[in-house]
Amino acid sequence: MNKISDTIIITSTSNEDEVDNNNNNNNLKEIDRSPRVNNNNNNILTNVNNNKNNTITSSGGSDSSSSSSNNNNNKIKKSKKHKEKEHMDSIVKLYSGKFDSWMVICHLFKYRDNPGIVDFLCNKMYNLEDKDIDFYITQLCILLINQPHDQKASFSSLARFILDRCASSFRFAIKAYWIFQAFEEDGEKNLFSIEGSVYLHSPSTSPKDVPMYSNDQIVPIDLDKIYNQSQYDDDDFDLSDDDGGFEIIKKNDHHYENDHHIENDPKKDINSNNNNNNNINNNNSNNDDNNNNEILPNENSDNSINDENNQYGNSNNNNNISGENDNIKIDINSQNKSDSNIETLNSTLCEETKTSPIKDDMENNNNNNNNNNNNNNNNNNNNNINNNNINNNNINNNNNINYGHINGSLSTLDGIGQPYISQPNDPIENITQILKRNRIIYKKVEEKKELATRLREFCEMSVITCSRPLITRPRTSSLPSPLISYNSGKIGGNYHKILSPSSVDSTSLISEDDKIIEKEEEDNVVEDDDDDEVNSEDFIPTATTTATTTTTTIPNHLSKTTSGVGINSNSSTPININSAGAGAGGGGEINHIGYDDISYLDKCKTPPAESKLSDHDFEFELSKSHRCDYLNDILSFIQKLAHISKILLPIPIDLRQAKLKHEISLLNINLPLGLYVPLWQSSNHHCVVRIPPEEVKILNSRERVPFLLVLEVIESEHEALSSNIFEVVSSYLQYTTGNSALKKDDIKRKYYSEKFKKSFLNSSINSTISNSSDSCTTETTTTSPVATSPTLPINIPHSKLINDGSNSISKSLPVTPTQSTVLNNLISTSTAISPPSQQQQLPSPSNTTTTTTTTTTNTNNTTTTTTTTTTTLSTSPTNEKILNENKQNSSPFGESWQEKIERYKKISPFGDYPNWRLYSVIVKTGDDCRQEQMAVQLISKFDEIWKETRLPLYLRPYSILVTSSGGGIIETIPDTMSLHNLKKSTPGFTTLLNYFKSTYGDPSGLRFRTAQSNFIESMAAYSIVTYILQIKDRHNGNILIDKEGHIVHIDFGFILSNSPGNISFESAPFKLTQELVDVMGGIQSGQFQYFKVLCVRGLIEARKQVDKIISLIEIMMSGPKMSCFVGGKEVIEQLKARFFLDVNERECSTLVENLISYSIDHFKTRYYDKYQSWLNGIYQ
């Protein structure tokens, strides 16, 4: 051979081979110290070995101990496998007895890097109760998103379990969908923040040029364009993307003034090409004339290696350093745009192992190269550059450049070589590292976002097909591929539209017996666990944006038009399933398909059991279309509520209430059938049938516009399962059996009668006057509903067409008389929803100001008209009784929740239904509700612990439904009032103790003592929770009291480590003012001693199960970024310290009593109440 190779392949089979290898390495060291000349006597030393597992690659100048290192590695691997087996055996033994959902979630997080344990635990979760799994749905989604291998996360057993739960539980599926959507929105926001950081740290960008983005201005971006922008060419810093790498150019003033790029110099190019060819052959030679070398990829060399076979070899191995007086150019071509290489690159940055995966790939590629001129292209060439070129003064060092920094820059990106050595006061180096770090972070965030999108789409398909979708495409199928017509939609707070899945392959379903471990599928998906390259096309569904409408020809008896209004039974009409028909249009109109005929409900109840048949089942395809539309209706409804909150923000405060009523009235008119909101604890399905506009209310907020809604729902006796969802929806109609036709006429007559209109207004006049800024006149109340409602003439022909069409359908279809009459009854009842709320002249967005102005100027006339109307409408005995009951209720709480339920049950068109219910919710938009959801989840765990130990401590958790990264729906607590409103609304209020005396009677009586005990038990419970979780912002607006005397805390925006204004003003462990102590009877009373005992016992029992609290918080810390985790790992350490784990129970009792003594009437607590009173007007 003509040249001495830098890479020597050594294969050892015995101790004698080791000695020979050591001698060969010593000879190689001597050769490297001598001048590099062509020496045919020094050839590559290769010992043939039949054992391929012991083959290693070593660099010139490095000692080799192949057998010993291999033996050590084998011992380490065996010890790891032994430990994993011990862990597995201990877990199997642990789970052989009793286990619960918390144990599974905790061990899933602890052993998340062990696939075997994860598979075992996921199989165990199939045996748990659904309610226990649903409680930890957020943690399960976080564990899935944060799995070690992002691209393989959708293959994992955890993903299969979640998708199986989505296929079986409609409630679980919708919640999981919104959680993954929130992760997707988080990724989009993070990508924009990284882009802003790139612009901010660029020398060519001034602060005024940094783009400001809002949540509504989110568009897809490509970070590669940032690095290809020409604006960097005119500055002291240049960063361009060349096959995924960086090019950093530092220019002197001469080149900057001439505005001439270095690469445009022809002399420079000639020298570069010549030196590049020379330096490949003589990379470590002592040539003093080589003063113009550059670090460039070996593109011009005749002996260059193919980029596809050696992607990293050219960038890392053919690096030649040039020392030039004026110009230094560094070209780092280190990464490829393929996902597999990005994953490999990111894995090197973790520095978990000393050997880089990139290094192994390059060694394998170089080992297969027999070209003698390419022997210098190995991954250890960087060491030769540092040790030979630099140390032997082969480069002109007049520039005083630290070449360790140059090599550090290479190693920072590639994960190879020496760490980065930062130079003080060097802005170029700092910017370089920031941009490199941002690029790597950008890629990782983008992968997380894509994974969240993929999982969200899988949740959609699980609901629509009632089974877990296949991750890989079917081997042989005559039907289209799964999800071929799906579209992921627009991101960034906008609604993700789901297209009708008429082309979804029926073979994409999996039977119920198929749980997790599918050997055949795993073999098809991943052939080699060590292979980091995963083809995304194998499991990412194909999304097409053009196929938005699917046309299917159906028989005559099932034909209907595109809009779902007209029904034609004479001819075969195609069904056009349009993606725009899900209600994303303006004006709050929500169109739905397939719910106007009871026959469609029958056809869509349950998919066929033979879901894997190759025949194209039309009924099953039609059911999938209806499921898609049903899911669209629910998502569109929630999105519309969030949109209402946004459009109220720019409106003046005094006009918001009228505008909110108007928007809710429009939404109420077009309310689709069977809307399901999975907010409450019950797993049974329910149907939202009406939203009374007169009960809506704007809540106090300085920056957002949250509002309160009252929902009329009909609960079902069945669970919200994906397979029987339409059976449940159709079961709501069975409550109107028996003389259905007569009942339909009675409802119509009742609706159009003057008596019903007067009754409705009479019962709701009080709430209308208090909540609305616009008044109701006599002329408005006596006007016909058809004349007052602008949208009613559209709804009436709609019902007529359906009624007429249903008669023809009943003749051609084998529908029972009960079903057909029930359908007509439902339609007439649905039409009867809107006119009562429209009897008031609702102001349009254009004339809102005019209406309010008229109301303000004519205050006296309005009052007189309202009084007259009340007197006129109070003729009915029933309505007069209701009004008298409202007047007699002089409690500061006003009308109780049960009284309101009875009142609406009498006047609601759906009040005759046996399972009719009334709920109230708060819609929040613009705030991330996930932190508050976590706080309520922790409170639920405390409540569970104390109930198990039978401690009389009272906590009132409430439900929070996260619908996006910036919004949610919150359950309200009925019959409660904040201490602020209690003091404000109670005439002559003095102290809380006097209120208890006036409300519950004599302090020695049973009612007072019961209310006092409720107050003490709730105060003790929330005092412990407030201290453990460090809940701040405890003013009287965030503390509620109910009619029974319980204290309830709400609004957990500041917990663990954050506080209002980032100022730790509330330094007391919990709020215990003198006013609260007086209700307990004073410090020396026996009731206050009872309070102390409850606090001590509560903390002692809680610290016995501290792992349930700690593990939940640790999992949440690995999820979305929340302000309560700004303290990092110290949050967990401080949380453990507050449980007093290092002391016994006696010492713990003393510490708790000290906390109570310290909190009594603390001066900072009083000052914070004064501050809130001065700033926000909250009563002290």
Curated annotation (Swiss-Prot):
Pfam families: PI3_PI4_kinase (PF00454), PI4KB-PIK1_PIK (PF21245)
Annotated organism of origin: Dictyostelium discoideum (Social amoeba)
Keywords for the protein's UniProt record, in alphabetical order: ATP-binding, Kinase, Nucleotide-binding, Transferase
Name of the protein described by the UniProt record: Phosphatidylinositol 4-kinase
Any GO BP annotation: chemotaxis to cAMP
InterPro entries with a match to the protein in the record: ARM-type_fold, Kinase-like_dom_sf, PI3/4_kinase_cat_dom, PI3/4_kinase_cat_sf, PI3/4_kinase_CS, PI3K_accessory_dom, PI3K_accessory_sf, PI4KB-PIK1_PIK
Compositionally biased intervals (Low complexity): 38-74, 271-325, 364-391, 768-793, 835-879
GO cellular component: cytoplasm; membrane; membrane raft
